[in-house]
């Protein structure tokens, strides 16, 4: 019996993207699809299958073909929680919190204690140009995403407008592409 990766790499073998790009796209996509439904127990902690992966390659190395190809498969399988192509830290947080609001009531504000603490907030950030999503030298946004990788509980966000949001068990997965030159623009030396 052949495993999924053998079958997927056979399916993508005639594309221009490398097998490595296709394999990592599949790993991230499967992890996003599984959400927090599976885990590995690690002492008192659980390790979930969400991954943060940046495919690095020169322009024209077909990173985007691997990323977009697996995202298309996820959509066909019914996966819906994809991040916007471009956003800010604040808007991204607000969008994740809104996943737990009543979409039929635009004035719906969750009251203290009404949030299901066992709910999860999965999201796949899939962008063939990482800098379009994260911005340049946006360490605050990247740090937030870093803190969410293994976050358990409800993450509270307070905004300058005195508004606040609650994000239960944020579970982001990241699959983005970048070139070495653009990577150095996003993460300049300190």
Locations of the language-model features?
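Phosphate-handling catalytic cores of nucleic-acid transaction enzymes
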Residues: 1-190
């Amino acid at each position: 019996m052949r495993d999924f990766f053998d079958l997927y790499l056979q399916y993508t073998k005639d594309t221009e993207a490398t097998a490595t790009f296709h394999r990592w796209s599949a790993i991230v996509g499967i992890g996003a699809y599984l959400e927090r439904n599976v885990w590995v127990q690690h002492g008192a902690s659980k390790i979930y299958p969400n991954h943060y992966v940046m495919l690095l390659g020169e322009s024209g190395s077909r990173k985007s073909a691997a990323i977009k190809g697996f995202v298309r498969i996820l959509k066909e399988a019914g996966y819906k929680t994809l991040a916007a192509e471009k956003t800010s830290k604040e808007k991204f947080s607000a969008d994740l919190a809104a996943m737990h609001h009543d979409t039929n009531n635009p004035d719906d504000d969750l009251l203290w204690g009404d949030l299901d603490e066992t709910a999860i907030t999965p999201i796949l950030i899939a962008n063939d140009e990482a800098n379009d999503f994260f911005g340049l030298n946006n360490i605050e946004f990247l740090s937030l995403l870093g803190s969410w990788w293994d976050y358990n509980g409800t993450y509270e966000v307070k905004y300058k407008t005195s508004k606040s949001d609650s994000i239960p068990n944020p579970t982001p997965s990241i699959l983005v592409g970048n070139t070495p030159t653009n990577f150095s623009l996003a993460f300049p030396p300190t």
